[in-house]
């Protein structure tokens, strides 16, 4: 497959030319490292792009550091997340603000290789719903990091590829590119940790959308404490690991399954990449509930139509 790195420019809302790539970076207490991460990204990405850094609070020193950068870099935005604290909510909010058709999620701690942002985006532009930077494919590797976490991640990734044909050997790595239209279609359910990567990989697998990968070399952070919490976030990872196995689902069936698990009263936020503007808290609760209700209703109608057609064929 030939990858084009210079596709025609997209036109966004209001007639403005949209960037080719939206880079989303969740950041918390990364003031000492975010500057180097931004330097590497802007030096590596030659295509039109926007970089969206999402923090939990303006009190985080990361906010001041990125704001100073943004004063001289028009492609950079620093936003305070409105969906709650934590990396999952920061990623969801950042993707909702993305103007490009491809969103690439990367970390602020310099563990990811920004030279791979454009190749990942090219895979999405060529039809993949999810493109993963894989530590466990040929040519990839992981340098440093907790041994237990690495073993679990490697086991999960390789078993999903072998048994579920997930499309990548590294479903758990957060360094991925996504089609924003695909995310609008399936939504994001994760609300804590970094489970979004495996969630969207599993959803793509179940609705039979393409998942692609390229090898990557992942470097453990040189300083500071990682925000990754293996035991606390394990249930979320296990949920999406198991979800990857199963029959093909339509987008409506997928939405109906998510609706059965939804708790809008506790999580009043619309799905990631909802194309409607951000609304007050109460309005967002209604939109979230309505989205799931409509999807579930559509699925019930389709099921009834299928049963009716089957009964008609039997009678004939």
Predicted regions and their residues:
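Acidic helix N-cap motif at the loop->helix transition within catalytic regions
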Residues: 32-36, 60-68
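Acceptor/aglycone-binding surface of glycosyltransferases and processive sugar-polymer synthases
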Residues: 79-97, 102-105, 114-194, 221-231, ...
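Short beta-strand/loop segment that forms part of the nucleotide-sugar
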Residues: 48-58, 79-81
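A conserved acidic beta->alpha catalytic loop
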Residues: 55-64, 110
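Hydrophobic helical membrane-anchoring modules
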Residues: 1-21, 26, 39, 165, ...
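Short, acidic, metal-binding catalytic loop of nucleotide-sugar glycosyltransferases
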Residues: 39-48
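Residue-level signature of catalytic and energy-coupling elements of molecular machines
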Residues: 94, 109, 179, 204, ...
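Donor nucleotide-sugar binding loop of glycosyltransferases
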Residues: 30-33, 58, 87, 113
């Amino acid at each position: 497959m030939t990858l084009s790195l210079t596709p025609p420019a997209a036109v966004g809302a209001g007639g403005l030319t949209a960037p080719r790539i939206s880079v989303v970076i969740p950041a918390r207490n990364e003031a000492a490292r975010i500057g180097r991460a931004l330097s590497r990204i802007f030096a590596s990405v030659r295509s039109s792009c926007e970089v969206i850094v999402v923090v939990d609070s303006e009190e985080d020193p990361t906010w001041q550091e990125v704001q100073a950068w943004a004063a001289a870099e028009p492609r950079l935005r620093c936003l305070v997340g409105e969906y709650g604290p934590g990396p999952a909510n920061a990623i969801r909010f950042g993707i909702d603000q993305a103007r490009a058709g491809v969103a690439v999620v990367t970390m602020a701690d310099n563990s990811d290789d920004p030279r791979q942002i454009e190749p990942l985006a090219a895979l999405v532009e060529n039809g993949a719903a999810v493109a993963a930077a894989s530590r466990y494919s040929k040519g990839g590797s992981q340098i440093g990091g907790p041994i237990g976490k690495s073993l679990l991640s490697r086991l999960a990734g390789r078993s999903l590829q072998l048994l579920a044909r997930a499309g990548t050997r590294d479903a758990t790595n957060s360094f991925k590119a996504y089609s924003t239209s695909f995310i609008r279609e399936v939504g994001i359910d994760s609300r804590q940790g970094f489970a979004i990567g495996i969630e969207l990989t599993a959803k793509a697998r179940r609705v039979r959308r393409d998942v692609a990968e390229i090898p990557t070399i992942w470097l453990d952070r040189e300083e500071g404490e990682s925000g990754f919490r293996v035991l606390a976030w394990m249930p979320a990872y296990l949920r999406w690991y198991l979800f990857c196995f199963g029959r093909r689902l339509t987008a409506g069936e997928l939405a109906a399954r998510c609706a059965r698990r939804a708790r809008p009263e506790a999580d009043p936020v619309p799905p990631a990449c909802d194309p409607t503007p951000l609304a007050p808290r109460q309005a967002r609760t209604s939109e979230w509930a309505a989205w799931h209700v409509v999807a579930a209703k559509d699925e019930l109608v389709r099921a009834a139509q299928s049963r009716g057609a089957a009964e008609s064929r039997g009678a004939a």
